[in-house]
Amino acid sequence: MARTVHCQHLNKSADGLDFQLYPGELGKRIFDNIGKEAWGLWQKKQTMLINEKKLNMMNVDDRKFLEEQMTNFLFEGKDVEIEGYVPPAEDE
């Protein structure tokens, strides 16, 4: 049976993550308050950030920047801004 959480990002009940994917207190907060769907949305944004900003995960400053962006996206409702990216237009 899937674990259910009240996802803070989506503001609804959602399937919870299967295990803690991020270390420390922030990882516990994500595990307790973020659903699989929201985590998937973050992973897409994270990949775009790493690629477009050429982040190096061996660099402490780059990891700190990415963690700040993750917190802003998942818990504060701030979208990730990526220079030059224009979302595809929705067909009407």
From Swiss-Prot:
GO annotation (BP), single: cellular response to oxidative stress
Keyword RNA-binding (UniProt): no
GO cellular component term of the entry, any: cytosol
Molecular function terms from GO: iron ion binding
One protein family per Pfam: Iron_traffic
SUPFAM superfamilies, A to Z: YggX-like
Keyword Transit peptide recorded: no
UniProt KW keywords: Iron
InterPro entries the UniProt entry points to: Fe_traffick_prot_YggX, Fe_traffick_prot_YggX_sf
Xref: NCBIfam families: PRK05408.1
Function according to Swiss-Prot or TrEMBL: Could be a mediator in iron transactions between iron acquisition and iron-requiring processes, such as synthesis and/or repair of Fe-S clusters in biosynthetic enzymes.
Recorded family membership: Belongs to the Fe(2+)-trafficking protein family.
Name the record gives this protein: Probable Fe(2+)-trafficking protein
Source organism: Shewanella frigidimarina (strain NCIMB 400)
Taxonomy of the source species: Bacteria, Pseudomonadati, Pseudomonadota, Gammaproteobacteria, Alteromonadales
